[in-house]
A protein has these predicted regions:
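Conserved helicase RecA-like core
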Residues: 1-195
Length: 195
């Protein structure tokens, strides 16, 4: 075949590799403290614009409902929503009327949102490729992003597999204390007043 005499292979990026612009962090928590840790992190990051990934539609709705009830600018995105509801949620999220989108992986497929600051794994996915795909939604176009995971002791073994696939270490950090949250919010408020 005269077409394949000197083939050239072109590769764009590496399959299932993380971006260098994303900082990966995990927080080791008790399973019962997962929601409180999420709230603490959101409070610590007032300018957050991100997606919280949950395992199930039910968990997605519960987390979003709890965030809304607690005064956060959030909404859910999952398969039980009608197409009109999904479109409305995505429109509000893209226009930044919402800071937090709580979603399942299936519902979030194909959505493309610019300038996400954070991806939060409320639960680690079972497959490392899903983690890579989730984290790749932030840190795009020369911007930096953060992918954080709330894990409990039964999920610790997954971190090593993800690190191997990423080719980098996932930092371990402590959930911010109430004092740290207050200080951060105070400094953020002062910065806004000075502008």
């Amino acid at each position: 075949n005269h077409y394949m005499t000197d083939p050239v292979r072109i590769s764009i990026g590496q399959k299932n590799s993380g971006t260098a612009n994303v900082r990966h962090i995990h927080y080791l928590i008790r399973a019962n403290d997962r929601y409180l840790a999420l709230k603490r992190f959101i409070d610590y990051t007032p300018s957050i614009y991100g997606i919280v990934f949950c395992r199930t539609k039910l968990e997605t709705q519960e987390v979003a409902d709890n965030l809304i009830h607690d005064g956060y600018n959030a909404a859910s995105l999952h398969g039980d929503l009608s197409q009109a509801q999904r479109d409305l949620v995505m429109n509000h999220f893209r226009q930044r009327y919402l800071q937090i989108l709580v979603a399942t992986d299936v519902a979030a497929r194909g959505i493309d949102v610019s300038d996400l600051t954070h991806i939060i794994n409320y639960n680690l996915p079972d497959e490392t490729a899903v983690y890579i795909h989730r984290s790749g939604r932030t840190g795009r176009a020369d911007k930096t992003g953060v992918c954080l995971s709330l894990i409990h002791s039964r999920e610790k073994h997954k971190i090593k597999a993800i690190e191997k696939q990423l080719g980098q270490t996932i930092e371990r950090a402590m959930v911010p204390s109430a004092k740290q949250v207050c200080e951060k919010q105070l400094f953020n408020h002062i910065d806004r007043l000075e502008k």
